[in-house]
Amino acid sequence: MRGMLPLFEPKGRVLLVDGHHLAYRTFHALKGLTTSRGEPVQAVYGFAKSLLKALKEDGDAVIVVFDAKAPSFRHEAYGGYKAGRAPTPEDFPRQLALIKELVDLLGLARLEVPGYEADDVLASLAKKAEKEGYEVRILTADKDLYQLLSDRIHVLHPEGYLITPAWLWEKYGLRPDQWADYRALTGDESDNLPGVKGIGEKTARKLLEEWGSLEALLKNLDRLKPAIREKILAHMDDLKLSWDLAKVRTDLPLEVDFAKRREPDRERLRAFLERLEFGSLLHEFGLLESPKALEEAPWPPPEGAFVGFVLSRKEPMWADLLALAAARGGRVHRAPEPYKALRDLKEARGLLAKDLSVLALREGLGLPPGDDPMLLAYLLDPSNTTPEGVARRYGGEWTEEAGERAALSERLFANLWGRLEGEERLLWLYREVERPLSAVLAHMEATGVRLDVAYLRALSLEVAEEIARLEAEVFRLAGHPFNLNSRDQLERVLFDELGLPAIGKTEKTGKRSTSAAVLEALREAHPIVEKILQYRELTKLKSTYIDPLPDLIHPRTGRLHTRFNQTATATGRLSSSDPNLQNIPVRTPLGQRIRRAFIAEEGWLLVALDYSQIELRVLAHLSGDENLIRVFQEGRDIHTETASWMFGVPREAVDPLMRRAAKTINFGVLYGMSAHRLSQELAIPYEEAQAFIERYFQSFPKVRAWIEKTLEEGRRRGYVETLFGRRRYVPDLEARVKSVREAAERMAFNMPVQGTAADLMKLAMVKLFPRLEEMGARMLLQVHDELVLEAPKERAEAVARLAKEVMEGVYPLAVPLEVEVGIGEDWLSAKE
């Protein structure tokens, strides 16, 4: 039992940071975080967050220690040291350099000693500081440093908890002076410490509990159980080597003054954080003025002010306006009566401007959306999809207070506009497409679309009967009833009872997969699979659309109001939610019957306009392939022509199977379909599928050249872009892992095609909307390549002609754009 420790009053506290270990840990923990330029920065961000957390409580003196580039004495003593670790990731060295720059800008001491690892430097610093009367904390998750623990030296884990000698005893039943002995006995795969084969953690702890130390244990080998003794004797060299490698050095002659840390270089630190788009860290490092400190001013605000508002829920057609404020030039104006104050605004300028515009339209007010920082951020990088994320990235915090949101909008707009200076194509997209489109979408959301509720109720009953019939058929084929919605029960029936081959396993649990992809592959293996797929489709559509749609009808308008998301996809396409109209199947019978429920107002008709093969036409324009261009210019069927070239037969000899193969390849090329996937789609041998793809590129040689050029530019610039300059960053084009790199390549050459098609649709909507208003018609829905309008019966034909003309002439391409038009009382009949 130790005697009572004398009272200790430390001179101060020293914080030692295991820089290399912390950087590597955060690099893997936050994978995927990049700047809007596609620059990976996850290690820098994670390191800064962990360091900030530690700096708030610790460290009169702070020293950050990194591994030196040269090999350490351990590598020289044992060539296999740390050989079990994966090679350094390609993005890591550059981020490590940025981390060191951050440390310097923060005014923190930085140290690396050639020939020694950070562990030895940290250990020597800790012991030196302890000897000089300091309390020491080491920020690390490296267990090697547990051997340093004492009453004055503690380890601060990056997750925030403190590791002390008492913690070590409670967790492992070991003292700090036993830790290197324990590691020597058990070994460590990551450091390639061999240890003693056959001695695990439990046995090692028991031996140290009995003998106190490795030294005492080795002096009493003859008193050990024979099995343990034999293992140790057989691996004595490994044991001694492991101890030498596990024991950290505490005697490095380091000349360090544990003085108080220097002040950070605030201006350069701010510029550094802004360059890496660490907006939230500007606040945390105290480099931003708080919006709460802004001057209060009376309502109404001056013209051009940015608005901030708070809704009771995210859907503006259903929400209450809880608070409204505006900010301009450092002053915040809070509206005493939010609804009444809407009349004082000429435009909704600020984050989520479209939502406020929709709410105003609901209230009978014309409040067009103006500048929205969200749209600027989205054009800079399409991964910017939420106000929370944009605020965090570019300097601020998205709070629940309207005044703070208004001030944030003003600050973000200035920041983002500055970043877009000189980016003329992106600015053109903002001014001519995205900003005016937000006003169009606001009107579409506020207008909504009628639903045939009686029809949906009847359809629900009909589908319920069909589901019950399919369920009974599945039970008959299985030989007994079971819960069809239980994946575990379905797994047993398919693979254990019916003996179907298990194709794949789930990622999380490793169980045999019953996913849609697996069932599709097993479709021909047993009749039950087809029935299960049909059951799943019907239950999904019933629960997602048929049953919920009537409940989404607004009581005030009697119409369904879907939300159009302008900043949600990586390609620039619009998406919708509440409900998601994109997921209604186009080609299945039930999907088509659901579309039948979307109907025109009494005395009106729906006009459906669909761009025909727009992505293939865009591909023809972007690639400049003469054969592809000629087909569209001459108005011939692209799939028949492709089949004719691929199979070497006249057009007249192309049969349905040939055309289907050509169609699959035509669209498959856009998404980087592999020969393996094509062989599955067409049920043909792999070699034949490979030959098909090769013949396709021989038929359209400039398509392959364009793909290669796009990938080359993507690697060089870090991004790919549409015809109009919309960007998508693809840093993984340089990834070492083949599957990751190939996925990035597919993404890279698909985005310019899909994104250009999206840009054309958006531009057409912007041009068409005012013309429709002049004719008393409405724009209702935009789904995939389709636009749905509503027009008075007597003007429906004229509206259809106008819309077709605008959409086909939206922008001159090397090939004509073609729009298929239909008119009907419901969405389905308008498509037929």
Swiss-Prot record:
What the entry lists under PROSITE patterns is as follows: DNA_POLYMERASE_A
**Protein transport as a keyword?**
no
Q: Show the segment(s) annotated as Polymerase.
A: 410-832
Signal peptide boundaries: none
Q: Which Pfam families match?
A: 5_3_exonuc, 5_3_exonuc_N, DNA_pol_A, Taq-exonuc
Q: Which CDD domains match?
A: DNA_pol_A_pol_I_C, H3TH_53EXO, PIN_53EXO
Enumerate the Gene Ontology biological process terms: DNA-templated DNA replication; double-strand break repair
Q: What does this protein do?
A: In addition to polymerase activity, this DNA polymerase exhibits 5'-3' exonuclease activity. Unlikely to have 3'-5' exonuclease activity due to absence of a 3'-5' exonuclease domain.
Name listed for the protein in its UniProt record: DNA polymerase I, thermostable
